[in-house]
């Protein structure tokens, strides 16, 4: 099915699009331009939407806004925004009456004419997705990047060729209702996350599994065998399972032997590069490269991989060196919105650091973070709703002694950054590594990271 054919199939149907955000707006405008009747529902008020509300109404859109935006929902086809649970009562009632519940990403999977490579996991998704996409580009492939990064691809599907590649980063929210899987799936790792939205860890893991559950026998799924959850998942993949490991050799996939990154396939193995070739810091980035190599094996030459690894400096907000100020290095790791991500960042430094942590409470445990802070942090500056939980995790950790690390509270984030600056000495490292989401103070992790960078870059020498 092509995009044009899908649009024709929508004619005469009542369409509801829930959430007028980044992923749904291009679809909404496309349908309206085609003369299709669309109702757009958004919990924001008309005042909060500003000129966008008037613009959509001028295009012929019916708007349901504000607290009761789902009241009287009635449609033949409902497009769900990724952040909204599919089982809210209003949607469930509509589905029971025969409505089709879908999403921009689900439709893209139906109509995409080229192979899809998709990445999910708790940590490393964006970096791994970016590495895969950039390697394919360096190898001369035409690549479309979307999902959680890039931009919505559905409206561009008719411009794609069968020889292109679509490379996607997919979240658990996007995957919850997926009934199709990509040609190549990558699961970087799984750890507790987003338990403020998912009922429990089991539902979170089940959502992630949709990235490979619907694959055919000819498709490929790549798993981190060092992670207990993803290692178990690899035994249930319907397609060809490939593994990657930093801790031991694998029969089919990519692994570390000393400093050598080795790819093994069909009984043959080769050294693709060494860990010294990887410019990005941290063992977690070695894992990201191993996952990416397994995904592009046979599509990209080893020379291209080595050259890229030596040059690629990483993705913004991921252990990003902001500035060295008066002998102190300041890093922006705002993407570290969970304990596991924060741990990976802390382990990338050779010295004990000054850590700024805390934020929105996603109802995930911090027990695993406590010992890592004890081992890697000299001063912990806490702010945000989770400050007390993180403090308790550190103080209850094995090996903790009062003052090791020292823990102080400073809120909001601007005050925490100032406190870190006041205490830092030449040679120190200060890292914004929140271990939490940003929604208590910021729109998202990027806005939080930009705020941090603006403060640090604004200091006069």
Predicted regions and their residues:
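Short internal beta-strands
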Residues: 37-44, 221-225, 356-357, 376-385
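Beta-strand->loop->alpha-helix junctions that form or flank phosphate-binding loops
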Residues: 39-43, 64-67, 102-106, 238-256, ...
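C-terminal helical cap/extension that packs against the catalytic core
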Residues: 53-54, 368-427
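Short beta-strand "acidic-cap" motif of Rossmann-like dinucleotide-binding folds
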Residues: 38-42, 145, 167, 243, ...
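Nucleotide phosphate-binding/pyrophosphate-handling subdomain across enzymes
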Residues: 3-14, 24-34, 142, 273-378
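Phosphate-binding loop of NTP-binding sites
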Residues: 70-75, 82-225, 229-240, 255, ...
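Residue-level signal for inorganic ion chemistry
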Residues: 31, 78, 119, 148, ...
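N-terminal leader/targeting and accessory segments in enzymes
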Residues: 1-103, 301
């Amino acid at each position: 099915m092509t995009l044009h054919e899908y649009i024709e199939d929508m004619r005469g149907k009542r369409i509801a699009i829930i959430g007028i955000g980044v992923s749904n707006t291009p679809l909404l405008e496309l349908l309206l331009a085609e003369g299709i009747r669309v109702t757009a529902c958004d919990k924001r008020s008309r005042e909060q939407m500003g000129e966008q509300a008037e613009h959509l109404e001028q295009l012929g859109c019916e708007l349901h806004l504000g607290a009761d935006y789902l009241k009287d929902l009635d449609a033949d086809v409902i497009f769900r925004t990724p952040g909204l649970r599919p089982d809210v009562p209003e949607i469930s009632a509509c589905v029971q009456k025969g409505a089709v519940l879908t999403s921009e990403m689900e439709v893209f999977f139906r109509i995409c004419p080229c192979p899809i490579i998709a990445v999910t996991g708790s940590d490393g998704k964006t970096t791994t997705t970016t590495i895969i996409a950039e390697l394919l580009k360096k190898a001369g492939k035409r690549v479309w990047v979307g999902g959680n990064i890039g931009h919505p691809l559905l409206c561009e599907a008719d411009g794609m060729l069968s020889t292109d590649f679509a490379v996607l980063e997919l979240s658990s929210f996007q995957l919850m209702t997926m009934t199709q899987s990509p040609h190549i799936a990558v699961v970087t790792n799984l750890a507790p996350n987003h338990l403020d939205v998912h009922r429990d860890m089991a539902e979170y893991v089940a959502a992630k599994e949709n990235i490979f559950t619907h694959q055919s026998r000819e498709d490929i799924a790549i798993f981190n065998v060092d992670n207990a959850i993803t290692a178990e998942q690899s035994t249930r993949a319907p397609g060809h399972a490939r593994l990657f490991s930093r801790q031991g050799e694998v029969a089919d996939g990519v692994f570390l032997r000393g400093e050598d990154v080795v790819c093994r396939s069909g009984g043959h193995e080769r050294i693709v590069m060494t860990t010294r070739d990887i410019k990005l810091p941290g063992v977690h980035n070695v894992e990201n490269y191993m996952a990416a190599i397994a995904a592009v094996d046979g599509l990209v030459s080893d020379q291209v991989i080595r050259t890229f690894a030596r040059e690629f400096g990483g993705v913004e907000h991921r252990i990003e060196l902001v500035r060295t100020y008066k002998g102190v290095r300041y890093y922006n790791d705002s993407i570290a919105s969970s304990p596991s991500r924060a741990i990976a960042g802390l382990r990338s430094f050779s010295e004990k650091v000054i850590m700024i942590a805390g934020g929105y409470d996603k109802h995930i445990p911090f027990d695993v973070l406590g010992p890592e802070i004890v081992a890697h942090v000299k001063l912990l500056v806490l702010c945000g709703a989770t400050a007390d939980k993180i403090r308790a995790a550190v103080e209850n950790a094995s090996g903790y002694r009062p003052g090791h690390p020292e823990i102080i509270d400073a809120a909001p984030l601007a005050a925490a950054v100032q406190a870190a600056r006041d205490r830092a000495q030449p040679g120190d490292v200060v890292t914004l590594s929140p271990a939490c989401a940003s929604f208590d103070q910021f729109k998202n992790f990027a806005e939080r990271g930009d705020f941090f960078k603006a403060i640090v870059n604004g200091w006069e020498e």
